[in-house]
């Protein structure tokens, strides 16, 4: 990604492009996991270069291909997310667990989940964490139709809620 600059208002933003076009790299930069060649990142008045931990505490990003949390159970992962984000909404979590049919998986280790169930887990965390900036990379891949409809309904709510920014990267508009 060269000569890229963005300032986004709260709501929902779609980053669309084909495979290998830099969508995931952009998400990693916005999450503070990949250094930009130039420029600065700020969320909620906190600059990444000045306060990296405070910045990351305002950003939700889960790389679904990562094995970083695989040894945790789903329930332990969600508890970890709850501890990390002060604005975590337990009621939204319960709604997401129900809407994404995650209850049967809460005691399973993440490495035991199918790709779709792992994605559902990270979506439940995203929808309930309360982060100022939530990054979703191809959130509908490997999901069943019921879960896609549920996730779209939560994204529609997020679009109307102007106190947070959601960035969705995908191949096409959902």
Stretch-by-stretch model annotation:
Residues 137, 143-144, 148:
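ABC-family nucleotide-binding domains
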Residues 123:
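Hydrophobic anchor residue at the start of the ABC signature
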Residues 65, 70-86, 92:
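Q-loop/switch helix immediately C-terminal to the Walker
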Residues 109-118:
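Conserved ABC ATPase signature
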Residues 90-105:
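Conserved ABC ATPase "signature" region
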Residues 39-50, 54-55:
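Conserved ABC transporter NBD signature motif
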Residues 31:
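Helix-to-loop junction immediately C-terminal to a conserved catalytic motif
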